[in-house]
Amino acid sequence: MEAILRAILDDDRPKVRKLLGADPRLATSLIETARLYQSKICHWIYVGDTALHLAAAGHRVELVQLLLTAGADPNATTNHRRSGPLHYAADGYITGPVWDPRRQVATIRCLLRAGAEINAQDKNGAAPLHRATRTRCAAAVKCLLAAGSDARLRNKSGSTPFHLAVQDTGRGGSGADVARAAQRQIIRQFLSFGLTPALKDGKGKTVLDSARSSWIRNMLSENPADPG
């Protein structure tokens, strides 16, 4: 298992292909020791993740396809967070050194074609759309909405993805110019999708109520408040 994990982190496709050819079980084996943060892919890896989780987190789309062809489960939720590979693919670190939104979208589409459940919720009730919104991955949000994500789905805190779009996520780099620009794009995407600032969370709080920044409130106030 160690060899294929190293090969995935190094994006060594010939090595991954060779290892899978020698032992196809590697496509479904579970990581048994904590890996924690992996700087090469800017993502956390946990016990119970699979090689597909690792490849999806790194948006290594060619490796994702190799693993799927070898029998990897696109809906594996064997880690403690009950997150699938699509959750990891929806995550991104847009201020990171290896950020590539096109590869992220390609990875998401690859997993969806393989049967990944687009509205699967992890143990906190977060679906891939929640994750993409929280990490300010505008291209991923657009891709997931177009593919049929439920934009009104609530996590265990009661928040819809639109509510997360107008809030400070607390994520590192969220105040950077690139993150603010992505946040603006995401808000526009939800509005264009037909959601309104009057959409309520599980506690009855609207999206407009959740917005604290004046520029966000101004964006929302320019749109109809019919909850639909």
Task: Please state what every model-predicted region is.
Residues 1-4, 30-51, 77-95, 121-127, ...:
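Ankyrin-repeat boundary/"N-cap" motif
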Residues 1-9, 17, 53:
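Amphipathic alpha-helical repeat scaffolds
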Residues 1-6, 114, 147, 167-228:
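Ankyrin-repeat-protein effector appendages
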Residues 15, 62-63, 103-107, 139-140, ...:
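Conserved ankyrin/ankyrin-like repeat signature
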Residues 20-26, 33-34, 65-73, 109-117, ...:
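Ankyrin repeat domain, specifically the short helix-to-loop turn at the C-terminus of the second helix
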Residues 104, 118-157:
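Eukaryotic tandem repeat interaction scaffolds
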